[in-house]
């Protein structure tokens, strides 16, 4: 694990070490708006109940395994090294009178990695370790750094997971980015590559969101001959509007396109103009902020 080079980095590269086994990996994230510290619960293999065609995690196997004490050590090592570098640079600035060196603040600690985090038996322990690291190094929940979970939303059907998430939302201000790729069973099946039931997934998302706030994230890209269009986006907007009308707390919607390679090379990103067109349909139908992310970053509406 290494610190990202200051002034370098790309949203198209979210590497997790040479063999994909790093537990802690700094990346530049479009949706975080800067430096995000990723946490990977699957250093040995990809583990997910979806097979999203756009997924950038290539199949692999490695010798590593997840251990909670190792995650704690890796987070502490990363933040200690970062603090040492920052102190050295501040000393240099004091000696030279310079103050123009770039320094990227940590926008979030994000639990994501090589699969679906809620499937891991270490999920709860990992969240607790991340929250502790944020308190130790970044000022806790009031320090300006989010604690984020990226999930495919299937865990919302499990009472143990929802109870844990609700507790983390209340105690640690956990921000949940919940995937909802589609507005009908066919669209959902194409984007998830799974047989998981669409209606049940939507119902479990809504059930949780009626109790705790979430962010909805939706991938928009070409998959073979399939491409989202304004008609489909109208159904998507109607779906979200219905959830909101029944009391779901959706903080905002993230519409984003593909930015990194996928193993099957079946997917292609949508251009900025097309993304804005589709986002306009959603914005007109829901009463929450809609943020739009192209290949290179956020697109102002």
State what each model feature region is.
Residues 1-32, 225-301:
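Auxiliary Fe-S-binding modules of radical SAM enzymes
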Residues 67, 197, 274:
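Short acidic-hydrophobic sequence patches enriched in Asp/Glu that either
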Residues 40-42, 58-60, 112-114, 152, ...:
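Short strand-loop junctions, especially beta-strand C-caps/beta-turns
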Residues 119-268:
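Conserved AdoMet/S-adenosylmethionine-binding subsite of the radical SAM
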Residues 21-58, 98-101, 107-111:
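N-terminal pre-triad scaffold of radical SAM enzymes
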């Amino acid at each position: 694990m290494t610190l990202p080079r200051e002034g370098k980095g790309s949203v198209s590269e979210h590497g997790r070490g040479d063999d994909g086994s790093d537990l802690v990996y700094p990346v530049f994230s479009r949706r975080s708006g800067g430096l995000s510290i990723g946490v990977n619960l699957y250093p040995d293999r990809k583990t997910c109940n979806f097979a999203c065609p756009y997924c950038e995690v290539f199949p692999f196997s490695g010798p590593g395994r997840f251990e909670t004490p190792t995650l704690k050590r890796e987070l502490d090592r990363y933040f200690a090294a970062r603090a040492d570098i920052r102190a050295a640079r501040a000393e240099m600035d004091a000696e030279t009178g310079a103050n123009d060196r770039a320094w990227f603040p940590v926008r979030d600690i994000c639990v994501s990695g090589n699969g679906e985090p809620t499937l891991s038996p270490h999920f709860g322990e990992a969240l607790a370790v991340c929250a502790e690291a944020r308190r130790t190094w970044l000022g806790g929940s009031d320090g300006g750094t989010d604690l984020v979970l990226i999930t495919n939303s299937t865990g919302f059907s499990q009472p143990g997971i929802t109870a844990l998430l609700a507790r983390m939302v209340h105690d640690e201000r956990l921000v949940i980015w919940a995937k909802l790729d589609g507005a009908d069973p066919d669209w959902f099946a194409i984007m998830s590559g799974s047989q998981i039931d669409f209606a049940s997934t939507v119902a479990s998302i809504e059930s949780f969101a009626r109790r705790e706030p979430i962010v909805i994230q939706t991938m928009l890209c070409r998959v073979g001959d399939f491409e989202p269009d304004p008609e489909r986006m109208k159904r998507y907007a109607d779906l979200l509007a219905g959830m909101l009308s029944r009391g779901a707390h959706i903080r905002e919607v993230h519409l984003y396109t593909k930015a990194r390679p996928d193993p099957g090379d079946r997917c292609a990103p949508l251009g900025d103009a097309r993304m804005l067109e589709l986002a306009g349909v959603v914005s007109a139908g829901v009463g929450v902020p809609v943020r739009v992310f192209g290949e290179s970053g956020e697109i102002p509406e």
